[in-house]
Amino acid sequence: MHLSLLKTKIHRATVTHSELNYEGSIAIDDNLLAATGIREFEQVHIWDVTNGARFSTYAIRAEAGSGVVSLNGGAARHVQVGDIIIIAAFASMTEQEADSFKPKLVYVDGKNQITHTNDTIPTQAA
């Protein structure tokens, strides 16, 4: 049996651009792609913390260090510049692989610069 597990996420990125008339995708600062291991053209899930929208698209590369997080094409209808989003990618693996797998979690500031990384999510207090 294969499981679908969180491979990586960029937590609380700020949408910097929204380009309705651009070919669909999400452009992501290349530094963030490198830190997460998200490949260009890989499917990603977008969860808008600001408005609750959830959808999927594919990643394309934006200039390294630019802080760009741009939703393009139809995806631009789901967000506004300034929205806080989570960008996530999943991987399929066997149960045996899942036993030792650790995701790459990347946390950013309001300018989409990396503040820290982790491979675990803190336990939520009750």
UniProtKB/Swiss-Prot annotation:
Q: List the cofactors.
A: pyruvate
**In what way is this protein post-translationally modified?**
Is synthesized initially as an inactive proenzyme, which is activated by self-cleavage at a specific serine bond to produce a beta-subunit with a hydroxyl group at its C-terminus and an alpha-subunit with a pyruvoyl group at its N-terminus.
Binding positions for substrate per the UniProt entry: T57, G73, G74, A75
Q: Name the enzyme group at the top EC level.
A: lyase
Q: What is its EC number?
A: 4.1.1.11
GO cellular component terms listed in the entry, alphabetical order? cytosol
Entry superkingdom: Bacteria
- Family membership, please give it: Belongs to the PanD family.
Name the chain's protein: Aspartate 1-decarboxylase
Q: Which organism is it from?
A: Stenotrophomonas maltophilia (strain K279a)
